[in-house]
Amino acid sequence: MAPKTETKAGAGFKAGVKDYRLTYYTPDYQVKDTDILAAFRMTPQPGVPPEECGAAVAAESSTGTWTTVWTDGLTSLDRYKGRCYDLEPVKGEENQYIAYVAYPLDLFEEGSVTNLFTSIVGNVFGFKALRALRLEDLRISVAYAKTFQGPPHGIEVERDKLNKYGRPLLGCTIKPKLGLSAKNYGRAVYECLRGGLDFTKDDENVNSQPFMRWRDRFLFVAEAIYKSQAETGEIKGHYLNATAATCEAMLQRAQCAKELGVPIIMHDYLTGGWTANTSLAHYCRDHGLLLHIHRAMHAVIDRQKNHGMHFRVLAKSLRMSGGDHLHSGTVVGKLEGEREVTLGFVDLMRDDFIEKDRARGIYFTQDWVLLPGVMPVASGGIHVWHMPALVEIFGDDACLQFGGGTLGHPWGNAPGAAANRIACEACVQARNEGRHLAREGGDVIRAACKWSPELAAACEVWKEIKFEFETIDTL
């Protein structure tokens, strides 16, 4: 007969459920330089203490689970657990807190944005004790930032490649975004580039559809680029969207672009995924291609004030994963974006070192050390009357994208492009002369209209067009 065995609780293990805060709420914790820090906007369910909710967020996004497990004794929780180290009530909101959580560096795979976000936001957002949860900001430690390649080239290298300095770059998204044949698409690209724009762009959902297969588009666009370069004497580019159903197909499209000799390609980094984007960024670094990033799907994640992730977090993820351009909103156009908040994450994209500034939504000081900067792209419902504000808000290191604001010109694409180029150069000259664009921008544009019929026609078409709605995502 087999001997009877008796199960006893060991000295280091007691089965059952205990409050998260007993292990994961540590207000006395001293944050380490190597820690990854997160700021969550947290709304507990009625009756749930904020300390318990903050601890639950730390636990469920690191080492914890709903009950005590005996395998806790096989590792060091003090070394690996996340810690909620501070709770801050949100002013003007009832039962809402900013929970600050510190994660040890060893929890994350080096150079993997996918692993970082799988851990921090992968599971905890569905936790029943929380009514809502939003990741407002992350502090990426220097030690972790150094494990990423980041953008393939960065702002300075891009300007050297294009030989364009002292002004914002100008672009245009080809419209209609779907339905054009490859030949007509290439014709639209050529007209915009010869008119004075630096770039044209595939829209985010232009991949390889029956009406225009990707290889046909690439060939006609390359022809348009070379023809416009020969006519203008300037380097031109088109963001050829390499986003595809598989990583293999994506890299095949990138290789085709490289062989055609075009300067830049494009990727939808949220719908395509961080792993695919990082792979493409490495390919672009190795083969001399610039990488334009579209943020399609971002508003599903970031638009609601109480739940999801703020775009500043998505922007940081892109700087780590890799991209030379990133759409960032316009402040003045048709898409959501408060001025101070937008400028906060634009600085996080471009600058090497950014101080904590709660007035702009920046919860942590961020040091990017070796990672190149990302050029913000202002796109969505902008036209020539917006140019003074755009130059004043974004400065030189930005790409201003006028889709309808180019193709909607009453005289055609090339005059529309010329109108935007003239408006941009007039605003830059006025700024360099010391004029205040926020106050005098309208006068600057009207003065330029006197010698530019293309600009005058554009100003007449869009003189009454405004997008004035209350911003949803405010500080």
Curated annotation (Swiss-Prot):
UniProt-listed SUPFAM superfamilies: RuBisCo, C-terminal domain, RuBisCO, large subunit, small (N-terminal) domain
Documented EC number(s): 4.1.1.39
UniProt catalytic activity: 2 (2R)-3-phosphoglycerate + 2 H(+) = D-ribulose 1,5-bisphosphate + CO2 + H2O; D-ribulose 1,5-bisphosphate + O2 = 2-phosphoglycolate + (2R)-3-phosphoglycerate + 2 H(+)
PTM summary: The disulfide bond which can form in the large chain dimeric partners within the hexadecamer appears to be associated with oxidative stress and protein turnover.
Residue positions where N6,N6,N6-trimethyllysine is found in the record: K14
Keywords: Acetylation, Calvin cycle, Carbon dioxide fixation, Chloroplast, Disulfide bond, Lyase, Magnesium, Metal-binding, Methylation, Monooxygenase, Oxidoreductase, Photorespiration, Photosynthesis, Plastid
N-acetylproline, modified sites: P3
UniProt subunit comment: Heterohexadecamer of 8 large chains and 8 small chains; disulfide-linked. The disulfide link is formed within the large subunit homodimers.
Annotated protein name in UniProt: Ribulose bisphosphate carboxylase large chain
Organism: Bryopsis maxima
